[in-house]
């Protein structure tokens, strides 16, 4: 078993904070802090075994991470896991959040007016485990689900969605643009998503992809922030008026 001094060196080498160690080992944060500060002179053997088990291991490399590793991360670290690679997510801008909110409202109002439709629209952060893939957990900006009763192969609980949503929307940011436009596009199509919108606030564009049985139905359609766009999830009854949204967000486009 590692000595305390060796654990301290491993902690530095691995770049773990006390919070990281508590989350990954299951040892309470207060106990971890006392051990590594020297406040606790004789920690319990079982506690040291848990810490030794964590700190003795070589850290996984990108491409080797699983959903279990993702779930063990501290709650205040926002990341996505795609094909075993962990991507840190930058804090969203005010424009990013305002756009998502402005798009969410008509969705929500539509569902209030159409209670017969067993649908749900969810704002990020919500975990989506595509195809129950153990190496992928994504947090789209907006997720739409149309429930199919007992025949629905997907599963939704209080923590995550297992399977492909019917509607996904991502708002681009400088740090996520290539991931949203290339990597996630491929993942969403391969998992069986029905519709994927990419909203580009910088160039005021919306690109819409529609899929059926994992096949792109037609060429993607590009719209501007002056257009109205029908939502396939609503059988094209719901129209998102981007010209109206653009007017609402005029302070960001001076």
Each model region followed by its residue ranges:
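Gly/Pro/Ser/Thr-rich low-complexity, intrinsically disordered segments predominantly at protein N-termini
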Residues: 2-16, 23-24, 29-30, 34-39, ...
